[in-house]
C-alpha cells in the first residue's frame, strides 16, 4: 500500500469541498444578482473546458502511465494508461446516457416558467438537482485524487471544475427559486448538490484506501483523465457555444489551455 501524506489528504479534501461549493455561487447569481452576461458565461465555460482538457491530457494521463509503468513496465504502463483513459470516457458516456445532461435544463426565459405552473417547475428543479449530483461524483473523485497525488495538478483542475459548477448552480437554483420564491431553498439546493463532490471523494478514498498501490493510482488517474476530457467536450464546450455571440468559445478554450500550461510551469519552478 502506498503511503499518503496527511498534509496532502487535508488539502485534497479542502480543495474538493471548495470546488463543489462553487455551485452556491451560481445560485447566488440567480437570487441576488442580475442575469449573467452570456458572453462572459460562454468564455468562462470554454475556459474551464480548455483547462480540463489540457491538464487531463498532459498531467493526469501521464501520471496514470507513470504509475502503471512503476507497477509493471513501460510498454504495459502506456497500454494500461491508454486503456483506462478510454475506459473513463466510456464510463461517463454510459452515465451521461442514463442521466440527463444538466446543461440542457430549462432557463427562466422558458415559457414553461409561469406562476401557474409551479408543479412543473418543481419537477424540473428536482430532476436537475439529481442529474447534477450524479455528474458531481466523478468530478469530486477527479479533484480529490489529483490533489492527493500532486496539489500542483489538483488545484488548477479544481479551479476549472469550480468554474464549471457555477452554471450548474444556476441550473438548479432557477427552477427551485421560481417554484418556491424562497432564496434559502434555492441556495440550499445548489449547495447540497455541490456537496456530492466531497462526498464522492470521501467514498472513493475509503473504498480504495486499503488497496492503494501504483496500479490503483494508475487506474484512478486513467479513468479520471477520460472522464474529464469527455465532460469538457460533451458538456462545457457545447454549453459555451450555446451562450456565445462571437468567438468567445475559441478564445476561452485557448485561454484555459494557456493559463493551465503557464500555471503548471510555474508550479514546477516553485517546487524543489
From Swiss-Prot:
<keyword id="KW-1003">Cell membrane</keyword>
<feature type="transmembrane region" description="Helical">
    <location>
        <begin position="40"/>
        <end position="60"/>
    </location>
</feature>
<feature type="transmembrane region" description="Helical">
    <location>
        <begin position="76"/>
        <end position="96"/>
    </location>
</feature>
<feature type="binding site" description="M2 metal binding site">
    <location>
        <position position="139"/>
    </location>
    <ligand>
        <name>Fe(2+)</name>
    </ligand>
</feature>
<feature type="transmembrane region" description="Helical">
    <location>
        <begin position="189"/>
        <end position="209"/>
    </location>
</feature>
<feature type="transmembrane region" description="Helical">
    <location>
        <begin position="211"/>
        <end position="231"/>
    </location>
</feature>
<protein>
    <recommendedName>
        <fullName>Zinc transporter ZupT</fullName>
    </recommendedName>
</protein>
<dbReference type="GO" id="GO:0005886">
    <property type="term" value="C:plasma membrane"/>
</dbReference>
<keyword id="KW-0813">Transport</keyword>
<feature type="binding site" description="M1 metal binding site">
    <location>
        <position position="164"/>
    </location>
    <ligand>
        <name>Zn(2+)</name>
    </ligand>
</feature>
<keyword id="KW-0408">Iron</keyword>
<dbReference type="InterPro" id="IPR023498">
    <property type="entry name" value="Zn_transptr_ZupT"/>
</dbReference>
<keyword id="KW-0406">Ion transport</keyword>
<dbReference type="GO" id="GO:0005385">
    <property type="term" value="F:zinc ion transmembrane transporter activity"/>
</dbReference>
<comment type="similarity">
    <text>Belongs to the ZIP transporter (TC 2.A.5) family. ZupT subfamily.</text>
</comment>
<feature type="transmembrane region" description="Helical">
    <location>
        <begin position="158"/>
        <end position="178"/>
    </location>
</feature>
<feature type="binding site" description="M2 metal binding site">
    <location>
        <position position="197"/>
    </location>
    <ligand>
        <name>Fe(2+)</name>
    </ligand>
</feature>
<comment type="function">
    <text>Mediates zinc uptake. May also transport other divalent cations.</text>
</comment>
<feature type="binding site" description="M1 metal binding site">
    <location>
        <position position="139"/>
    </location>
    <ligand>
        <name>Zn(2+)</name>
    </ligand>
</feature>
<feature type="transmembrane region" description="Helical">
    <location>
        <begin position="11"/>
        <end position="31"/>
    </location>
</feature>
<feature type="binding site" description="M2 metal binding site">
    <location>
        <position position="165"/>
    </location>
    <ligand>
        <name>Fe(2+)</name>
    </ligand>
</feature>
<feature type="binding site" description="M2 metal binding site">
    <location>
        <position position="168"/>
    </location>
    <ligand>
        <name>Fe(2+)</name>
    </ligand>
</feature>
<keyword id="KW-0479">Metal-binding</keyword>
<dbReference type="GO" id="GO:0046872">
    <property type="term" value="F:metal ion binding"/>
</dbReference>
<feature type="binding site" description="M2 metal binding site">
    <location>
        <position position="136"/>
    </location>
    <ligand>
        <name>Fe(2+)</name>
    </ligand>
</feature>
<feature type="transmembrane region" description="Helical">
    <location>
        <begin position="250"/>
        <end position="270"/>
    </location>
</feature>
<keyword id="KW-0864">Zinc transport</keyword>
<feature type="binding site" description="M1 metal binding site">
    <location>
        <position position="168"/>
    </location>
    <ligand>
        <name>Zn(2+)</name>
    </ligand>
</feature>
<keyword id="KW-0862">Zinc</keyword>
<keyword id="KW-0812">Transmembrane</keyword>
<keyword id="KW-0472">Membrane</keyword>
<keyword id="KW-0997">Cell inner membrane</keyword>
<keyword id="KW-1133">Transmembrane helix</keyword>
<dbReference type="Pfam" id="PF02535">
    <property type="entry name" value="Zip"/>
</dbReference>
<feature type="transmembrane region" description="Helical">
    <location>
        <begin position="126"/>
        <end position="146"/>
    </location>
</feature>
<dbReference type="InterPro" id="IPR003689">
    <property type="entry name" value="ZIP"/>
</dbReference>
